[in-house]
Every structure is written in C-alpha cells, then in structure tokens.
Design a protein with these regions (language model features):
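Active-site-adjacent structural elements in enzyme catalytic cores
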Residues: 2-160
Length: 160
C-alpha cells in the first residue's frame, strides 16, 4: 500500500498471526518492532500510555513517527522496551484502510529486511505478488523518504 513517502507492507496490528506473516514475508527479526499507523488518536487508545493521548505533536499528523510509552494493555508483539512507534496518517488510502478496519495497522517498508525500499509498484508486485493477500493501489504522498522517527519524551531524533 502507498503511504506518505514509500510503499509499505502491513496488517491489522491486533492480529498476531498476520503480524507474524509480515515478519516471515520480509525475512525480518521478530525482535524488531513495527510502526503502528492509525487514522486518529482514538485508535491508539489501548496502544499508548493515556498520558500521551492529547500531545499536540502526536495529533499534528506530520510525517513523523513518535516513540511513545506503551499502554499496559498493548500487545507485547507491538512494543519494544515498553514503548511503541506510532503515526497518525494523513495519507487518504491508509486513513481509509484504518477506518475500514476500525483500528491501526502495523507498517514496514515494502522490501526484504536489510534491503533498500522500493518505490516502483511493478517491482513490488513482482517481488511480493504470491506472498501477500492483497496489494492496495494508490499514489504515494508528497514525501520522498521514510518518516522521521522521534522520541516524544526526549524529543531525540532517531531517524531523519
């Protein structure tokens, strides 16, 4: 599916079997966490610590993924060191996908682990066609890279 900057692979964040399938498809370590994308902050209700639900940075829908303390009810496969990586999307395709699912998705770049991301939909289709359940059509947003990642508590930039 298209995002603001690159094509992604993802699934229902609360479906551990589907998350495991994404890990297998990418050849990715299960110890690496995913970015969680949602259409609005309400979809983060059981994912992030309630103290951070109304942070203006999180609500801005900028192309920034925030590392936020995890909610105590957040599934363990979504957390790393009691934190989660979350982004409220402004991309219409992903926004509608999350709304239709009525919840967040995990997201990772459409490539094999430790390879460069691919922004050619034909190459992505050739690479993943028989491995994924569905390829969502749509244009990329106006960004030309992966999202910036920042820690919401320390404001440290982890990826530019």
């Amino acid at each position: 599916y298209p995002t603001e900057g690159i094509y992604g692979i993802g699934c229902d964040a609360f479906n551990q079997k589907s998350v495991d399938k994404v890990i297998t498809i990418k050849g990715r370590s299960a110890s690496k966490s995913f970015i969680i994308i949602c259409s609005d902050v309400i979809q983060l209700n059981t994912i992030i610590d309630q103290d951070y639900m109304n942070y203006k940075e999180l609500l801005a829908k900028d192309f920034i993924t925030w590392i936020v303390p995890a909610h105590k009810k957040c599934p363990s496969w979504l957390t790393m060191k009691n934190t989660v990586a979350v982004r409220i999307t402004s991309h219409p395709v992903i926004n509608n996908l999350c709304k239709g699912l009525d919840g967040p998705i995990i997201s990772t770049s459409a490539n094999y682990s430790n390879h460069s991301y691919i922004n050619d939909i034909k190459k992505i289709e050739a690479l993943f066609d028989k491995k994924v359940d569905y390829i969502v059509e749509g244009a990329l947003g106006g960004e030309v890279k992966s999202s910036t990642i920042k820690n919401i508590v320390t404001k440290e930039v982890l990826r530019k």
